[in-house]
Amino acid sequence: FNELYNYFEEEWNKAHEILNNKNEEEFFRNIIKLTNEDKKDKDDLVSPYKIFLKVIYEYFEFINREELLCSPADYGYRDYKYQIDAIKSGINGIMLYNGVLISDVVGLGKSIIASAIAKNLLLKEKVEEIIIICPPKIIDSWENYNSEFQIKAKVFSIGLLDKALEYVRNHRKNRLIIIDEAHRFVNNKTYSYDMITNICFGNKVIAITATPMHNTTSDIFSIIDIFDRKLTKNKNIEEAKIKILKEERELKSKYKKSENSKEENIKKSKEIAKEIMSLIHTIIIRRTRNDLLESSEYRKDLEKQKTEFNDVEEPKLHDYELGDLSKLYYDTLEKISPYNEDNEDNKDNSNIFKGVRYKPLIYLKKKTIEDKRKSAEIVKEVYGEDANFDFADLSSNNIAKFMRHLLVRRFESSIFAFKKSVENMIGKYENIKRFVRGRNYYPIYKRGDVNYEDYSDDDNDIMIKDNSKKYEGLYIIENVKEVLSKEFFIDFENDLKILKEIKKYWENIGIEKDKKFFKLKEELKKFKKENDKRKIIIFSEFKDTVDYLYESICKDEELNYLLKPLKSVADSKNRETVKANFDASLEERKQESEYFLLISTDTLSEGVNLHRAGIIINYDIPYNPTRVIQRVGRINRIGKKLFDKIYIHNFIPRLEAQKDIKNWQISNFKLTLINSIFGNDTKILQKDDEINSLFSLKREAGIFSDLENDISWDIEYREIYNKLNQDNNLLEEIKNMKDNIFIRRENDFNGLVEIRKGENGIFGGLLKNSVMDYNMANIFKILKAKENEKSFKPSDKAESLIADFERRKNIKKINYKPDALLKLERYKEIMGLEISLNDREYIEKIIKGIEYNIFTEKQIKNIEKAFKNNNGIEIFKEIKKIIDYSSLNYINYIESDYFKDSILVVREEFFKNFDK
């Protein structure tokens, strides 16, 4: 009762007086007047077409109404219309949802857009400070933007998240956090994800990435979850996310089994894409070059500023004969990663490299109770208190599988990289043997969630120190002979034997038998002859391959003379040389022409302009196709057009059997989803169907979605808005239309649409067959009408639809109560007066935060651990370490209702087969 009474008093005190003895007569006179006007309006129903135009006008006018206090032109850049619109949309999204994902394709100026948004928010006094978090290699670039736009930002490396978090907690301010290359935070179960979430919690956020999806569509949601605690935390949307992820898993399974045709895969990918965009479009800015060319407004602006895009030619595949190495190639593949490696029958095959060194926990003894106790202790010590044997097995297998796949990728990259990896692995295996024999202990990886994209070289992050048992990133298994089964030592020796056999097979294979390199040489000479002024970039995943190619080309007198090769290395002097020779955005007086060929790893494919080059050679195909997108994006930039066409060349072996084509298959499958969801300008791997002839396969080895012509959902409506602004009479009529319009229309479903406008934006809801949808793309599609369509008065059933809409529109809370929530509720009651009023409010806010699903999984687990490992007031002290007290003011923002204090613009009732 007391809680309800206090709530009533609180709301009552907020109330405004609207009627008293002094204004009674005027008040009721106005009521009668408004009632008569309302009745007149209802008798004179507005057509659905005019309503549709009104919604379009209100939607785009709100964005355009955003007054910018500065633009890129104020800081030495051009004011492109598409960038100005993105800046306005970004500010709108940040004010409405506390964050925005800027995901324009590579080369359209995402960093400029983000910098301009940051400067405007500072000038508008919406934020007090800017923090930028980015990879080390682009810190210099961001320091330049920092200086140019005068935003006085604190710039932190992604590798120093702990420093960023410490700074945020020690210096309380209203901030904007800019996260560049946000795709690095797609795994929401990692320590770094937990860190970035804590840094951003309660702050405004701009996440930047051209490639927000790496492995699954859940990647996109993980990035958005860093800042969004409102839109996608709605239970309706949570359920939709679960459904989408399930559909994707089913599609992937059918793809692997070749149950679907290529056309079916693409069709289903597009369906999944539409569902995803229906959830996130309001907090993502994503345009392709085709969007800019499709929009007459953007196209004219680009033409006016004499800005053209490069035409990217169809990618060309260069398959090379393996010749005498063909049998050795296949035999080696079968040893390190057999085609049916997931088949359990392989477990006892002594001819297969298992990667035993990376998964010793699988061999923990479990025969006796004491064995199980000791083994369980080791598992918990390595992976945490919640870990069990199943988790340890899964994590161990993940790291072993990763290392085998890494070996395959290096094998497919170059003979040199592969031979070096085998030698390194043999050395590491021999080191482990010495540790076991001499000291009876074993160093083991603590990481089970290895990210394929984060590792390019061998496991050289293991740092073994002779005089210390402190291993960076490792745990030491002591008394190893007593805790590991004899099968471990047998399989370990077998792995070592296989590695030595492979080394022996390949040790006499040198550059003279490297068919891939000879194919490259042949093509390079041809490129140089055909394109005299066109510079070339060769990309590889691996530094060893880059070194090998650079040294081999330098030794070839003809190529060295023709191309003057440059190798990209990680130092500032080399980076300046690369920019001087390959960056067309530099002042002409700073540009040089000393080098015509650049050989680089993917570290250079992000954050650097290389558009003086017109040819890209992918010497190997990454496991993740977003890497290839980023490679191409380095030379396909907005601004100066140097070439009519850009060329992409991909190198792959000509396989004569269905052996290991996993990289290509996986890349094509993922690329279909990526392009379906986000659209892309360019084919980057293959021409349609060309892969089949290359691999001589009876079934398709890959799928590629030809989606270059896909455009963003709002381009069509933006065109209507622009035409409306050119018709003065119609525009004036639409502008003078009153709000609070309510009509009924015929359609193929039962439902209701509402469009509202509030302080921070135009938003809406669609209730269709008892399911809520907040996607404006879907709502606009429903509102779309022909000029001759008629309106009808709302039916008697409208009130029940409105009630259903109100009930469903803001369902935020979770469907279940986790242990942490139950324990906190009990704890609050038990502690009573032992904690202060402020501390009780703190606990209540954490409870609400859990109900609204705003904390990470790790935070929830840590709260549960606090209860498990502590008692009384110590529990509270531990919780305060987990959830920062001041950040919980963010709960007030979460609880706010978009629909509260908003104005109803339009409400349309839909019935199928209704009585007119």
Over which residues does each language-model region extend?
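ATP-dependent helicase/translocase motor core
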Residues: 1-105, 112-123, 193, 497-500, ...
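SF2 helicase/translocase NTPase motor core
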Residues: 61-81, 88, 110-202, 231-271, ...
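C-terminal accessory region of SF2 helicases/translocases
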Residues: 41-59, 63, 292-305, 641-916
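Inter-lobe coupling linker of SF2 helicases/translocases
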Residues: 155, 159-173, 177, 181-185, ...
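Conserved Helicase C-terminal RecA-like lobe
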Residues: 57-79, 95-98, 105, 118, ...
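SF2 helicase motor core recognition
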Residues: 164-167, 213-217, 547, 592, ...
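A short beta-strand element within the Helicase C-terminal
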Residues: 219-222, 608-621, 646-650
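Conserved SF2 helicase motif VI
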Residues: 624-645
